[in-house]
Amino acid sequence: MPQGFQVTGRVEPETHRIIFSIRGQIDSRVLIDRFIEIYAGIDAPWTYDRVFDYRRSDGLVEHVDVDRIAAWWAGHIPADAPRSKVAVIVNNPLDLVRARSVNDQFPKDDRQTFLSLDDALSWLDEGHK
């Protein structure tokens, strides 16, 4: 992994969420490799709501790598998998718009993009209380 670039993923069993934290200058290929590695270590990851926190990162995910994770995800989730919620947290209004451009590649996800963790968590909690 490039120096200063870090991708972590943790499962929160009490909320049934996977929380991804991305820090540093994004290396698109490495980022997607790490997502796949984390997902592969979780039983039925498609049953979890997910948070992707990009607030402490810089750079863009290349389209070829978005295509790669979308294809990997589609190939690993069952056809009858329920929809899950995905909150993407970014650090500026431009990325807010950019992040939404990939929503159609993940048809089983109810995806929303946010500028704050609090707003993302409030949205994830809706309907789960």
Show which residues each predicted segment covers.
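Amphipathic, Lys/Arg-enriched alpha-helical "gate/interface" segment within cytosolic domains
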Residues: 1-129
